[in-house]
């Protein structure tokens, strides 16, 4: 006899950009009485992260095809068929009502297995360029959602799930109301840092025509090097950290952000209401540049492509931003935010449950 509670199987893996949005939707449905289980791979971050959130996880063996040698490409169809078979066994054993694909290699075999088993599939694409797996699965999914316009021609734009403490920050008009003095510049290159930000910012800031207060997330293993770079350029009071544990606090502090434009970062800075200068990571499909483009078009951000980034160019960009414009950018960012992506996706899942 099937359990009376509705069940969702989440398929997501590989990176935080896939896993964290999946967890947000899972938590939303858990709060409404749903049972959640996860499908992932044993050698990626979901294997450790998902159980810490109290969700049981099953594993299948699957790897990406890009960059593989000829022998592995020849063997790939057999590996994919094996992964689909493994996923079907997990689905048959647990009998979910709906399957949610958030991207990563695991979503492909898992989504096909769900479709073959007659289980409705819901997709969410976090980036402005759809991943290969989601491109395939969009043809068999019952509902397809996208965080930014352009990933799919007719999919509903629902944003990315954003952590609650970021969504609850006061409006920029309230935060900026009494601010005077040096402009507060927050630099974030992700948990691994960004070498180009770590080298360019310390050179650029001493050349600015106005005072800057700096908080720089350097990434793992780079704190001392970046601190020394600031000192070498005459800035002794730069706040440099490996990581920022409380991102909401950092966004609330900042007048302006210089950062990469990963999908979750773009969604977070919009929800927080902070103007940004995006330096997209160079990728052949320009994924990060297209993620940033939505906020650039609505006046919430500026973008400098990595190949165009120079010390003098960054100096000129920063010198052109005064407090009035920073407030306008921050307000435009907040106006563009979609802060209920988890609820929207959860509602679609509920509508498909029999």
Swiss-Prot record:
Localization recorded for this chain is: Cell inner membrane
What high-level taxonomic lineage is stated for the organism?
Answer: Bacteria, Pseudomonadati, Pseudomonadota, Gammaproteobacteria, Vibrionales
Q: Which Enzyme Commission number(s) are on file for it? A: 2.4.1.227
Purpose: Cell wall formation. Catalyzes the transfer of a GlcNAc subunit on undecaprenyl-pyrophosphoryl-MurNAc-pentapeptide (lipid intermediate I) to form undecaprenyl-pyrophosphoryl-MurNAc-(pentapeptide)GlcNAc (lipid intermediate II).
Where would one find coiled-coil regions in this protein? none
Has keyword Cell wall biogenesis/degradation? yes
Q: What class of enzyme is it?
A: transferase
The family database entries (HAMAP family) matched by this protein are listed as: MurG (MF_00033)
Check the record and name the CDD domains matching this protein.
Answer: GT28_MurG
- Membrane topology according to the record: Peripheral membrane protein
Protein name from the UniProt record = UDP-N-acetylglucosamine--N-acetylmuramyl-(pentapeptide) pyrophosphoryl-undecaprenol N-acetylglucosamine transferase
Chemical reaction(s) catalysed: di-trans,octa-cis-undecaprenyl diphospho-N-acetyl-alpha-D-muramoyl-L-alanyl-D-glutamyl-meso-2,6-diaminopimeloyl-D-alanyl-D-alanine + UDP-N-acetyl-alpha-D-glucosamine = di-trans,octa-cis-undecaprenyl diphospho-[N-acetyl-alpha-D-glucosaminyl-(1->4)]-N-acetyl-alpha-D-muramoyl-L-alanyl-D-glutamyl-meso-2,6-diaminopimeloyl-D-alanyl-D-alanine + UDP + H(+)
* GO terms of molecular function: UDP-N-acetyl-D-glucosamine:N-acetylmuramoyl-L-alanyl-D-glutamyl-meso-2,6-diaminopimelyl-D-alanyl-D-alanine-diphosphoundecaprenol 4-beta-N-acetylglucosaminlytransferase activity; undecaprenyldiphospho-muramoylpentapeptide beta-N-acetylglucosaminyltransferase activity
UniProt keyword Magnesium, yes or no: no
Q: Which UniProt keywords apply?
A: Cell cycle, Cell division, Cell inner membrane, Cell membrane, Cell shape, Cell wall biogenesis/degradation, Glycosyltransferase, Membrane, Peptidoglycan synthesis, Transferase
Coding gene?
Answer: murG
Top-level division of the source organism's lineage:
Bacteria
Single GO cellular component term: plasma membrane
Q: In which pathway does it act?
A: Cell wall biogenesis; peptidoglycan biosynthesis
The entry marks the following residues as binding UDP-N-acetyl-alpha-D-glucosamine, namely 15-17, 127, 163, 191, 244, 263-268, 288
């Amino acid at each position: 006899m099937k359990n009376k509670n509705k069940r969702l199987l989440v398929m997501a893996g590989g990176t935080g950009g896939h896993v964290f949005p999946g967890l947000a939707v899972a938590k939303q449905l858990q709060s409404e009485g749903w049972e959640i289980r996860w499908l992932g791979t044993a050698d990626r971050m979901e294997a450790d992260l998902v159980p810490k959130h109290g969700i049981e996880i099953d594993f299948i063996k699957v790897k990406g095809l890009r960059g593989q040698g000829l022998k592995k490409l020849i063997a790939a169809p057999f590996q994919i068929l094996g992964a689909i078979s493994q996923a079907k066994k997990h689905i048959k054993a647990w009998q979910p009502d709906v399957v949610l694909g958030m991207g990563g290699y695991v979503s492909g075999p898992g989504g096909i297995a769900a479709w073959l088993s007659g289980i409705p599939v819901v997709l969410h694409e976090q980036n402005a360029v759809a991943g290969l797996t989601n491109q395939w699965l969009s043809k068999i999914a019952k509902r397809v959602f996208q965080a930014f316009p352009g990933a799919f021609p007719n999919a509903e734009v629902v944003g990315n799930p954003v952590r609650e403490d970021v969504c609850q920050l006061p409006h920029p008009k309230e935060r900026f109301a009494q601010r005077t003095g040096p402009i507060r510049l927050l630099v974030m290159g992700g948990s691994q840092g960004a070498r180009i930000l770590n080298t360019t910012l310390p050179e650029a800031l001493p050349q600015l025509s106005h005072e800057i207060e700096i908080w720089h997330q350097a990434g793992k293993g780079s704190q001392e090097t970046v601190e020394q770079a600031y000192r070498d350029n005459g800035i002794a009071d730069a706040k440099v950290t490996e990581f920022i544990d409380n991102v909401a606090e950092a966004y609330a502090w900042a007048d302006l952000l210089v950062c990469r434009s990963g999908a979750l970062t773009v969604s977070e800075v919009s929800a927080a209401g902070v103007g940004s200068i995006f330096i997209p990571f160079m990728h052949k499909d320009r994924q990060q540049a297209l993620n940033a483009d939505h906020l650039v078009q609505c006046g919430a951000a500026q973008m400098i492509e990595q190949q165009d980034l120079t010390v003098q160019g960054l100096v000129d960009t920063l010198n052109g931003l005064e407090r009035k414009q920073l407030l306008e950018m921050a307000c435009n960012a907040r106006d563009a935010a979609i802060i209920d992506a988890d609820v929207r996706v959860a509602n679609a899942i509920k509508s498909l449950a029999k």
